[in-house]
Amino acid sequence: MSFLFKYNEKLKFDTGNENYYELMKDGLLHFSKVITFITSPFLKVILNLNGVSYGKNVTVFGIPRIENKGSIKLGSNMRLISAKCGYNSGNLSGGVFLRTSKSGKITTGDEVYLNGTSIISEEEITLGNRIMIGANTVIMDTNSHNVPYKDRLKRWDKIIRKPVKIEDDVWIGANCFIMKGVIIGKGSIIGAGSVVIGEVKPYSIYAGNPAVFVKAIEEE
């Protein structure tokens, strides 16, 4: 299947493939079954229809799923990667998913890379600057259901909600779960497959289920 795109100078990016870049300039890209690059006008339609505010040079690969009943604010120079072929074909997930309830709030800084990441907020989830998140990672600020079994399918007012904060320069590996109330300190790394349920110290590596301290990272 082929798709015709209009080349847009504002959406330049480095693919490491000169032929790919030349095809962009010629306005013709060939992909199999999935759109892997969205031009600026199409991107604006997706975000604007969902009430999402965003900065400059936001690049989308594939089509993100957005359900915004609260507030979603994206920074500048971001990449939302949902494609399963083309750029960064290591993506193993179904794509970027951003969802807020009426009370939910998602805010990101600049240079944040979401690679098939799901962010679900009923309270507040804040991401700083220069953050990389691997495929299939889920970030939530709520239990989703009550703990007592009689209330799990009802009494939504009793669900526990706590803000999540991810500070600058954090790298989160693939297939991680970041749970309610978590604070991940500046410059830290979360190993692939980890479940984070508490506070992560700055400039540290945490891994496991639940994630535990592995070692410190030297500050430059």
Which residues are covered by each model-predicted region?
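Surface-exposed acidic, glycine/proline-enriched linker/cap segments
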Residues: 155-165, 169, 175
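Glycine-rich, flexible loop/turn motifs
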Residues: 94, 160, 196
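Domain-scale signature associated with acetyltransferase and cell-envelope carbohydrate enzymes
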Residues: 1-140, 167-168, 186, 202, ...
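Histidine/lysine/aspartate-rich catalytic loop segments that bind and position anionic ligands
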Residues: 128-161
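Beta-rich strand-turn-strand
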Residues: 116-127, 174-189, 194-198
